[in-house]
Amino acid sequence: MVVVTGREPDSRHSDGAMSSSEAEDDFLEPATPTATQAGHGLPLLPQEFPEVVPLNIGGAHFTTRLSTLRRYEDTMLAAMFSGRHYIPTDSEGRYFIDRDGTHFGDVLNFLRSGDLPPREHVRAVHKEAQYYAIGPLLEQLENMQPLKGEKVRQAFLGLMPYYKDHLERIVEIARLRAVQRKARFAKLKVCVFKEEMPITPYECPLLNSLRFERSESDGQLFEHHCEVDVSFGPWEAVADVYDLLHCLVTDLSAQGLTVDHQCIGVCDKHLVNHYYCKRPIYEFKITWW
């Protein structure tokens, strides 16, 4: 007995496959055939789309031209509507994409006429551009605020040793203290210093020059850990202590935390000769609810 099926051959090895597009690799062969000659085992016909395409993006309805969806070849949308992949339709015949459609209109506006979203939508539209693999849109969004500024900020943070690890430590310490004390908030001490070299409490050039003449044994006395929960520094960049504090507040707030901080003094530990550690100490207050 010979059993003949209508299963489509693997089109990934056919001459018509998009070998250069990563977007198309995300799709599987059609779960439901678009056109078959049942019982004869013949290849499936490509799915055909109308010139004007009705869309259902996660429940949000849009209508656009097929040429708009295919404007850039190496994108997920161009691959989806190339005819090589089966796109399901809803009860009204709209082609369905299981994705939040809140910002899909901004994506369509770029494909239609090159329009860019307002600044407050840039981050969200950038996420959609990544999903649909729209390179030209990604490139332009990354040259807009706030993404352009974020690139500069990350370049600075890249010079900061263990920044992410220390940030996580702040959150974990604050959480543990709040739980242990059954408190709404927790406080912790954070040292932020740009320069490794401690300074004297006196503005005296003679005393300051001593730091360049210290012995190796004296050098060990300069290496100490301030009595704080977390320390940030040193770093080599124009950005100063206040810039790093701003980064800390920004990243902690992005996790949904309420953050307050204030300088409560300096370490002031005596090191050697006339030298005292003058690294600033900040008190961070993390409020959980």
Swiss-Prot record:
Residues 1-42 are annotated as: Disordered. The keyword Electron transport does not apply. It is found in: Cell membrane; Cytoplasm, Cytosol. One of its GO terms (cellular component) is cytosol. Residues 53-141 form the BTB domain. One of its GO terms (biological process) is protein homooligomerization. It comes from the Eukaryota. High expression in brain, particularly in post-mitotic neurons. Expressed in the mitral cells of the olfactory bulbs, the hippocampus, the deep layers of the cerebral cortex and Purkinje cells of the cerebellum. Not detected in astrocytes or microglial cells. Also expressed in heart, liver, spleen and kidney. Its main location: membrane. The keyword Membrane applies. InterPro entries: BTB/POZ_dom, SKP1/BTB/POZ_sf, T1-type_BTB. Keywords: Cell membrane, Cytoplasm, Membrane. Interacts with CUL3. PANTHER family: BTB_POZ DOMAIN-CONTAINING PROTEIN KCTD7, POTASSIUM CHANNEL TETRAMERIZATION DOMAIN-CONTAINING. May be involved in the control of excitability of cortical neurons. This is BTB/POZ domain-containing protein KCTD7. The lineage of its organism: Eukaryota, Metazoa, Chordata, Craniata, Vertebrata.
